[in-house]
C-alpha cells in the first residue's frame, strides 16, 4: 500500500494565522469537500484542491460539518451555539441554536434527519418539522453517528459512555467504557459494510483504546491498544478498511478489525480529522496547523501463481488460495499485514512484517485445498521478491539472492552483476530446484538451489521484464523493456523469432510449440512459425495450460478458455494432421474436431481421422474407417475406392460415383444411387451391372414411392416385383377393400403368409365374408373359427363346431366370456359347462351366488345354489376322484338353495309394507326355517327376521305357545331399533293369551299318524317314528308322502316296471248312504277304509315303526307290484345318485313334482305359480322345456 499526495492546502486567516481544521465532510458524489476551518466553512473541489467558496455565517469557531446522504444539503455547527443548514448550491437556508457550543452533527442516511449535539443536550431536526426536539444529557457529547438503516443514533460522551438512542431520542443501550471520565470517547463510526449481519460500532477513546461493539452493546473481541490519543475514526465506503488519526500526527490505515496496516500521512501537528472519499481510495486529513492533505491510496497486488493454484492478498491481512480449475477458494487469516506471497507445488510462503509462514497441503490430492502451517521463520526480512521451493525460500534484494532453509539458516547466496528484474522457479527434484533469473542488463541465468554457480543461458542488449521456458526446456521466451517478445533456442542461443507489443509471455505446458503473450489489450497465440492469432483480452498472461490461459486483470485472476482453433487450422492448411491433432487435444470445438477428422480422412490419414471421430462420437464415420481398415488387412490397396467411400459418406455422391466407375465398381454406384432414390442416375449403371439388380431397383423404387406418400403406386410396384406382403400391407393400411379382394383371389393358396395377412386386413375392415372366403381357401379352420368368434357370429361358429368338435373350447370359452361381459351370467355358466371348463363354470356361479346374497336377492341366490349343486353333481359323475367331495357339496348346496328359497318370502314380508302370502303360509315358512337354523345360520339370513315373522304369524293364528317361545328367543338376540318397541310390547301382550297352540295348526305324521308339536326338537321329522316330513315347496305344508326304499337286489328299472304292472285288487261291495238336511237330500257312494291287510305297503308302515332310531320303509317286489302308478312319485336323480321313491297315502290329494329340481307342490299351487312365472318357482325351468 502506498499513499500518493494528490493536493495539499494550508488554511490561514487574514492575519496569516493558521486555522485549525476540526472537521471534514464529502459530498456523497465525492466532487466537493466541506471543511470546518476557523469560523468559516470552506468548500473545495476534490479533483484539484481549488477553493470553490468560503461560507460565512458563524461568529465563532466551526467544530463540525456533515453532508446529507441525498446530497441536497449539509450542516455546520459552531462554538457560537448555532447550526446552519446549507443547500448544495452553497446557500444558507436555516439556522437554529442550542444553549451550548455545538460539538458534532450527523445526518440520518435514510430519513435525512439531522442530529446536532452540544455540551448539555442534543437536538433532532428534519425538513418536515418546524421545531427542533431537544434532549438533555448528563455529559458533554463529543461525537455521534447513525446506524446504516437510520434507526439508531450513537452518542460518544466525555464521561466515557456511549449512548445508543432511537429516532425519538430515547436511550435503548448504554455502553460504559472501563476508563470512565478519564477516557473520554472522542470518535465513533458505524461500519457501512453490507456483508455484516450486525451493525458494528467502532469506538476510539482517549484512554488510547480502539473497541468494537454490536448494536446490543455486546463488545466484539478485546480492546486494541493505541499509542496515541485518537481524534477521528472513519470507515471506507464498503467497510473493509478504516482510517485513524490523532495525537501521533499521522493518519494510519487499519483493517475493519483494528489491525494496523501502515501509515498514510505524517504531519507536523495533531491530525484532528480524516475522511475517506465515497466509493474510492482517496483519504483527506485535517490538521491543527490548518493543513488539508488529499491522498490517493494505491494497493499493490501481492500474489503468487503455480500452475492452477493462485494465491493473492485480500483485505491486506488475509491470503486467498484459488484453484483456477475447480474455482475452489480457501482463506488463510494472518491478522497482520501480508507483504509477500510465494507458492510452489504444495508449499505456500507468506511474509508478514516480523515473520515468514510456510504452509503445506494436507494431502497429495490435486484438488485438495486444506493448508496447514509447516514452519515459522520469526525474523524480519527486507526483500524485493520472495520465492519458495520444496525445502527453501529464496529472498531477492536488489542484486543479491539468498537461499534460506525453513529453519532460517542461510545456505547459499548469489550476487548478480545487475539488478534482478524477474525470477521464476522452473521445477526440479526437491531440494535441487532450478530458478530462471532475468537481469536489468539483459542477462538470463539459470540457478540451481544446490549449486553456488549460476549458469548464463544468454545475454541480450535490453533489460528483461518477463521470462518463461518451454516444457522440454529447449526454448526461452523473453519480454524486454521495449515490450518485444523474443524467442531463443537455448541450445544454439539463436533468436528464432520476435513479436512486438508484449508485456508478459507464457509457454503452453502441454504443447512445446505454442506460446501466448499479452499486450495492448490483445492476447496473442503463436504456434510454431505460423503467424500470430490475436483476440481481445485485458490483463497480463501469467500461465498457459492446455486451452486455459491464466490472466491477471487489476486484482483478479481468471482462467480463460481459449479454443485452439486458429493454430489447428494453420497446421491443417499444411496437411500436418498429427500436429493438428495434438493442438486440438488442448481444446477446440466439436465443429473443429469434425473439420480435422474430415480433412484427415480425405487425406487418407485414417489413424488421425479415427482418433478425431472418436472425440466427437461419430459412429458412422468410425464404422467406415473400421471397414476400410479391415479391407486393407485383407489386401485391398485401391485408395481411389477408399476415397469414393469417403465421398459417399460426405454426401459428394457424383464424385463418389466417378471414382467407383474408375475403380470398376459400377455395382456400388448403382447401390448408392438406389439407396438415395436417385433412380434416374441409377439407370445409367444398370446396363453394366448384374441383371438381378433390376428387381432390386424396382423394390427400392417402390420403397421410395411409399415413403414419398404415393402408396397406390408403391403397392402396384411391389406387386410387380413379387413383394406381395409389402403390397398387402400398404393396401390394408389404406383400407382399399377392392384391391385386397382382388389380390387375395389372385394369390395361390400356397402363399399362406400373404393370404393370412390379406384376411386379417379384411377382418379389420369388417369384411368378414371375404375374410372367411380366404381362410376357407387356405383350409385354416381354426382361423375361420376365430374370425366368427371375433365377429360374434355365434351361429356360424356353432355349426362349424358341430362338424369339428375338436374346436369346442375355441368357441364356447369366448362365447361364455362374451355372455359374461354382457351380464348374461347364467348362459355364460352353461357355456363354460359345455366347453368342459368346470372350474370357470363353478367360479361364475359362486360369484353370482355371493353377489345375490350380498344384494339381498335371495330368490336368485336360491336358484344359483341349485345350479351349483347340479354342477357339483355333474362333476361327481365325470370325475371319480372328486366324487365324495362333490356329493357332499351337492347336498349342502341343495339345502342352501331350499333355505334361501324359503327366506325370500320372509325377507319380503319384513322389508315390504304388504305381503302376498297368506298368514298360514308365512307361519309354515318361518317354522320350517326356524327348525333348519338351529345349528348354523347361512350368510344373509337373519334369525331375527325369521323369529319375528314366526312370532307375529303364530300370534295371529292362535299359536300362542309358539309365539311366546319366539319372542323369548328374540330377547336373546340383538334386535334392530325399529323393532325393539314392537317386540317388547308384543312379548307382553302375548303373555295374556292362553299358553297353548291352535290344534288346527298341529302337523300330523302320515306314517305313524302322530300329532307333532309345532316346535319340534327333531326339526322337520316326526317325534315318534323319526320319518322326515315332505313339504310343499310353495306353502310348506306337510305333504301326505312317505319315502320308501327298495330291498337289496332290486334295481330302479325293475322297480319302475313292477310298479307299472298295477296288479288289480279285489273290489269290495260298495253301498249307498243317504244324507238329508232341512232342505235337501243326497246319496253318497260309501267308500270305506281299506283293510291294512289288503295294502302291503300300509302293513309295512304299521309293523316297522318304533324305536329311537329312524327305520326307513323298505319294500319288496310283491309290495311294488301292489302299488298304483298314480300313488308313487319318483325322483329320478342322475348318476351317481340313487332314485328316491315316495308313496302318497292320500291319493285324492293331487301332488305335482317338478321333473327338473324334483320339488313337490300341491298341484293347484304349482299350476298357479307356473302361470304367474312361466317357469318352475324353484329351478326356473320353462314350462315348454323338456327335461
Swiss-Prot record:
<feature type="repeat" description="WD 1">
    <location>
        <begin position="16"/>
        <end position="54"/>
    </location>
</feature>
<feature type="repeat" description="WD 8">
    <location>
        <begin position="459"/>
        <end position="498"/>
    </location>
</feature>
<dbReference type="GO" id="GO:0008589">
    <property type="term" value="P:regulation of smoothened signaling pathway"/>
</dbReference>
<keyword id="KW-0677">Repeat</keyword>
<keyword id="KW-0970">Cilium biogenesis/degradation</keyword>
<dbReference type="InterPro" id="IPR056152">
    <property type="entry name" value="Beta-prop_IFT122_2nd"/>
</dbReference>
<feature type="repeat" description="WD 6">
    <location>
        <begin position="225"/>
        <end position="264"/>
    </location>
</feature>
<dbReference type="GO" id="GO:0061512">
    <property type="term" value="P:protein localization to cilium"/>
</dbReference>
<dbReference type="GO" id="GO:0036372">
    <property type="term" value="P:opsin transport"/>
</dbReference>
<comment type="subunit">
    <text>Component of the IFT complex A (IFT-A) complex.</text>
</comment>
<keyword id="KW-0217">Developmental protein</keyword>
<keyword id="KW-0963">Cytoplasm</keyword>
<dbReference type="InterPro" id="IPR015943">
    <property type="entry name" value="WD40/YVTN_repeat-like_dom_sf"/>
</dbReference>
<feature type="repeat" description="WD 4">
    <location>
        <begin position="137"/>
        <end position="175"/>
    </location>
</feature>
<dbReference type="GO" id="GO:0042073">
    <property type="term" value="P:intraciliary transport"/>
</dbReference>
<dbReference type="GO" id="GO:0036064">
    <property type="term" value="C:ciliary basal body"/>
</dbReference>
<feature type="repeat" description="WD 2">
    <location>
        <begin position="57"/>
        <end position="97"/>
    </location>
</feature>
<keyword id="KW-0206">Cytoskeleton</keyword>
<keyword id="KW-0966">Cell projection</keyword>
<dbReference type="InterPro" id="IPR036322">
    <property type="entry name" value="WD40_repeat_dom_sf"/>
</dbReference>
<dbReference type="GO" id="GO:1905515">
    <property type="term" value="P:non-motile cilium assembly"/>
</dbReference>
<protein>
    <recommendedName>
        <fullName>Intraflagellar transport protein 122 homolog</fullName>
    </recommendedName>
</protein>
<dbReference type="Pfam" id="PF25143">
    <property type="entry name" value="Zn_ribbon_IFT122_C"/>
</dbReference>
<dbReference type="InterPro" id="IPR001680">
    <property type="entry name" value="WD40_rpt"/>
</dbReference>
<dbReference type="GO" id="GO:0045494">
    <property type="term" value="P:photoreceptor cell maintenance"/>
</dbReference>
<feature type="repeat" description="WD 7">
    <location>
        <begin position="266"/>
        <end position="306"/>
    </location>
</feature>
<dbReference type="InterPro" id="IPR056838">
    <property type="entry name" value="Zn_ribbon_IFT122"/>
</dbReference>
<dbReference type="InterPro" id="IPR056153">
    <property type="entry name" value="Beta-prop_IFT122_1st"/>
</dbReference>
<dbReference type="GO" id="GO:0007507">
    <property type="term" value="P:heart development"/>
</dbReference>
<dbReference type="GO" id="GO:0005737">
    <property type="term" value="C:cytoplasm"/>
</dbReference>
<keyword id="KW-0853">WD repeat</keyword>
<feature type="repeat" description="WD 5">
    <location>
        <begin position="180"/>
        <end position="223"/>
    </location>
</feature>
<feature type="repeat" description="WD 3">
    <location>
        <begin position="99"/>
        <end position="135"/>
    </location>
</feature>
<dbReference type="GO" id="GO:0030991">
    <property type="term" value="C:intraciliary transport particle A"/>
</dbReference>
<dbReference type="GO" id="GO:0005929">
    <property type="term" value="C:cilium"/>
</dbReference>
<dbReference type="Pfam" id="PF23377">
    <property type="entry name" value="Beta-prop_IFT122_2nd"/>
</dbReference>
<dbReference type="GO" id="GO:0035721">
    <property type="term" value="P:intraciliary retrograde transport"/>
</dbReference>
<comment type="function">
    <text>Required for cilia formation during embryonal development. Acts as a negative regulator of Shh signaling.</text>
</comment>
<keyword id="KW-0969">Cilium</keyword>
<dbReference type="GO" id="GO:0048593">
    <property type="term" value="P:camera-type eye morphogenesis"/>
</dbReference>
<dbReference type="Pfam" id="PF23381">
    <property type="entry name" value="Beta-prop_IFT122_1st"/>
</dbReference>
<dbReference type="GO" id="GO:0032402">
    <property type="term" value="P:melanosome transport"/>
</dbReference>
